[in-house]
Amino acid sequence: MTNKHFDLIVVGGGILGTFHAYHALLAGKTVLQLEKDNYPVGATVRNFGQVVPSGMEAEWFEYGVAGLEIYKSIQQEFDISVRNNGSVYIASDADEQTLIHELKAHYDTLGYETELLGQAAILNKYPAIKPAYAKEAIFFPQEISVEPELMIHRLQQYMQTKFKNYQLHYNSPVTACQRKGNGVEVGLKNNSVLFTGGKAVICNGYEFKLLYPELFSESGIVVSKLQMMRTVPMADVKLSGNILTGLTTRRYESFEHYCPSFQSIKTPEHYEELKKWGIHILFKQAADNSIIIGDSHVYADVNHFDDLGFDLSHHINELMLEEAARIVDFDVRKLQTTWAGFYPQHPTKHIVTYDLDDCIHIRTAIGGKGMTASAGYAAESIKNIFS
């Protein structure tokens, strides 16, 4: 059975694939998006929902800034859960203070709005932060947060409402994708269902076994497993926006690339075990007043993804809770759920791209910056695909 022809077929229903579909639709293309699961269940819905261009470097910062405007413009038309409460990085010692001052100097040269907060200002704005932790902070008022478990569904609902030339099919794992004539043919269910398109873009998340497994096995991609937790709703806690902490200043690429002191600062002894497990502490208060806490990072190469396991390490969760309790004055152990998320990344590339020919394009392994950078990156990617 062959269905109608589309200008673009997007394989993958996560944030990267969905924004590829969105920008193609804006360009007037007919788009079919195919998602293998009942609905998106991967990294797009298992994260903090923090959109933080301030943590990015080079063109990825630009993609993030463009993404802020895209999210905000869509929110004006349709509620996709965007809240504009800014991002704050809290320094807990002198080295971290040096880093935030150096980052401010960098962003001042770009004209990207930022503000330094002293301890009193931090405690006034974020009364849940412990005074002993908060030495100084850098605040980015224009940055946003979304509800990760809601946003992708709302975005796809918006696209279905706005664009008549958009089709979205769940429960549609693509098992074949090949060149056919001047376009591409995509197959489902042992090719009993076929779709044809002018072009296909594959945004496959951490699914590397259904399409082009040999290509991915040699790609150098690694998969990161992260652990996160959510508290019960805490209406009396005020912690708006994206809360990033001292460990984040020692990890994010913007600090690494733009802060001259980054390479010379020493890791305090109390951070050693945390760094071993790739832990840095973030908080994001959800719309229901529950608070997401995380996260950790352990890795396996793409050929040994299953070695990461589906279990949660109690030791890692305990390390995160102990550090979180050092930062905030509410009971971080009032948890309602904990989970593991997975995302692919590459050790030397910001994203993995393959143009198999002029019709079949792979865009994957965007790493931990999908929520921040996908909207802006996909705009440029679609221009290139259709150029």
What would you call each of these model-derived segments?
Residues 81-89, 123-163, 303, 358-366:
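Helix-loop-beta segment of a Rossmann-like dinucleotide-binding subdomain
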Residues 48-125:
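Dinucleotide-binding Rossmann-like beta1-alpha1 core, especially the glycine-rich loop
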Residues 26-45:
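Glycine-rich FAD pyrophosphate-binding loop
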Residues 2-14, 32:
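Beta1/beta-strand and adjacent pyrophosphate-binding region of the FAD-binding site
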Residues 22-23, 51, 81-82, 204-332:
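Active-site substrate-recognition segment that forms the wall
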Residues 139-187, 195, 199:
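Helical element adjacent to the flavin cofactor pocket in flavoenzyme catalytic cores
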Residues 278, 287-292, 298-387:
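C-terminal catalytic lobe of FAD-dependent flavoproteins
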Residues 9-11, 194-207, 378:
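Short hydrophobic core segments
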